[in-house]
Amino acid sequence: MAEFDYIIIGGGSAGSVLADKLSADGRHNVLLIEAGPSDRRFWVRAPIGYGMLFHDQRVNWMYDGVPEDELGGRSVYHPRGRVLGGSSSINALVYHRGQAGDYDDWQAAGNPGWGYEDVSTVFDSFEHPHPDQNPVCQTGQKAGQKTRDPVNKAAGNAASRSHLSVTDNSAECHPFGATFTSICNEAQVPSSTTPYREGEGVSSYLMTTRNGMRCSSAVAFLWPAMKRANLAVRTNASVRRIAFEAGRAVSVTFRYKGAETVLRARREIILSAGAIGTPQILQLSGVGDGASLQKLGLDVVQNQPAVGQNLQDHFGINYLFKANRPTLNDVFGSWPGRLSAGLRYVLTRRGPLSLSINQYGGLVRTRPDQTRADCQLYMNPLSYHSFHDGRRRLMRPDPFSGFIIGFNSCRPASLGSVTITSPDAEVQPRIHGNYLDHQQDLDDAVRMARFVQRLQEAPALKAVLAEDPMTPLADMDDAAVIDDFRERGSTVFHLCGTCRMGPDRRDAVVDPQLRVHGIGGLRIVDASVFPNITSANTNAPTIMLAHKAAQMILADAG
């Protein structure tokens, strides 16, 4: 039986980083197992491909949740990357660290070393502005104030090639963005023409692009590492289970090229299969709620009821507006517009195809007495209607000039779960978001809708409307706002927390070093270990977490 020092399950945002860092010095043999294919595909590399990949089963797990009681029986669609780079290869490219308090809360929950003072230097080590641009705004700073550039100074050496390009695309964003800035200014919302990478403020979003192409975790970290002789990558390889001996994880069984293969790990097995895949694989391997596993005929390796619990996600809503001037609808909604944008992109790697449709937004406080931002805004110069289950026709915008203002609560309180229903690894697990189960989330929805109402009443917004708002919040009482939120609200695709980090195995799956409680040789490194969801998009903190985990793993290796 072949052996590796480290076996990494999942080649996504975290797994790509681990494959790079653990193989970098040549001392360790590393295997990366990815269920999906290579990411070397046009629609994966082109930023606008986000809309094409939203329902592409070749690179997308396309999970469906169970009917949600608080959503009137609606189920929620969960796209997740099934390709090298994982969800960083199919997401909307927005890069945001969140808020310092998110990580301080991690530390306060019994996880020393995970406070913002500790992790900010990790972020600095891999973020790289591309091309060299104005420094980005940080918490507590005013627009135009000088800031630290991300640390990545050795431009000529091999290490410098292993960085994440975090790009200010404001020059390429649709000119409708000036209207969004005016709306925020009139509503007294902190805003800047310089993008924020953390904390409070509205601006154009930073994006993970490089030279007009998506810079996923695979592009940034895995591609440079794949030339190394001590790194093996298996794509289209579906993990079935992890095997244990004497309380230690020792091997991985996976299906590859039509046959089951078993490979052993001399040092560690690292689960990086994401907030859905990681608890699924643990449960299939006999680690989870013992009674539930026995009912499925599975041998219980360790009774760990916390596996698959504590599912957290951002849940939001969009408000659509008809505009009296051109938006991206006019580009993507006509053949001349699409052809012109396509030709420009092919020739120059610029224009609307070179960036996300999520172009503007940020974190805001919906009440001035709050100590931190509680709401994330999205202000998109494009509008589209969603289906009842949340699926979107992103490449077929509404047949009129339109735009969107949407929001989600930064730190929702409802907790869901991910549990297997079959011993067959090919059967998707049961995903229960449990959205809006907590009263806080309903209160947040009303408060944030009233905040958007303030934006609706700004003269700058009224000046660009072709007709009254499609959702006239001023005419809706709180009950109507909540009914609308239940009817149309949807995930923002930031699932996390299903194998949370913490000191007590009764409610946590891994310790602060990301080692699975009670089992040797097994760590979890992905968004499933988040003790609490971060305030913004989760790709940035997941990549940070993987860098910090690699430091821990290598330190233990000596």
Give the residues covered by each predicted segment.
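Conserved redox-cofactor binding core of oxidoreductases
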Residues: E70, A108-G140, G144-A249, R255, ...
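Glycine-rich loop(s) and the adjacent beta-strand/alpha-helix scaffold that form part
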Residues: R27-N29, G36-D39, V122, I242, ...
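N-terminal glycine-rich phosphate/pyrophosphate-binding loop and immediately adjacent elements
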Residues: M1-D124, Q304, H314-A323
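Residue-level detector of alpha-helix initiation sites
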Residues: I8, G12-V17, A171-E172, A275-I276, ...
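FAD cofactor-binding and catalytic pocket of flavoenzymes
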Residues: Q133, R148, L320-A445, T491-G497, ...
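A glycine-rich dinucleotide-binding beta-alpha-beta segment and adjacent secondary-structure elements
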Residues: G49, L206-T209, R234-R248, Q376-R391, ...
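A conserved FAD-binding loop/helix module that cradles the flavin
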Residues: I533-Q551
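Internal hydrophobic alpha-helix adjacent to the cofactor/substrate pocket in enzyme cavities
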Residues: F451-E457, H547-G558
